[in-house]
């Protein structure tokens, strides 16, 4: 789906003209949608910060992240793309983006028994893998059941395999990152 005011309105369940009445600029609209997206992502991935986190919970967080990115493609693209640019003029956006990552990192740190520096490295590595999987799995959805030219060639055969068994794949990824 192409990013547009119309597609954002549809994804947000509002009329196509509503965005024009409520925001001064397109960038202000994009920032508001991205802010809301980060809040929804945080809520979907939330783990109580006072409790021990299991590997299974971290895998579930990763799956929630991926599901959000696939289901809310336009919002996700605003959250992580360049349409808004610098978040600094939008303090609520900056706070919601940081909060989303902070919950992920906090949860990871309660599972891994490492120094803060190692946790930062491992967490951004895991987040990068999960973030990358969103893009790859979105591509798998676009291809759907269409036959690949050479199914054994290229990354799509691997992507399709991962998509068919995402939970097990993420379990291995999380285990590998946490244990190394």
Where are the predicted features?
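Amphipathic alpha-helical recognition patches that constitute DNA-binding helices
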Residues: 53-60, 64, 99, 121, ...
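Short linear capping/connector segments at secondary-structure termini
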Residues: 46, 79-88, 147
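Solvent-exposed, amphipathic alpha-helical segments
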Residues: 40-51, 129-136
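Helix-turn-helix
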Residues: 1-28, 32
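Hydrophobic/aromatic-rich alpha-helical bundle segments in the mid-to-C-terminal region
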Residues: 91-94, 109-172, 180
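Helix-loop segments that flank and shape redox-cofactor active sites
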Residues: 21, 46-55, 85
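Alpha-helical structural segments
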Residues: 11, 28-48, 60, 64-67, ...
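Helical hydrophobic small-molecule/effector-binding pocket
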Residues: 59-80, 127-130, 134, 138
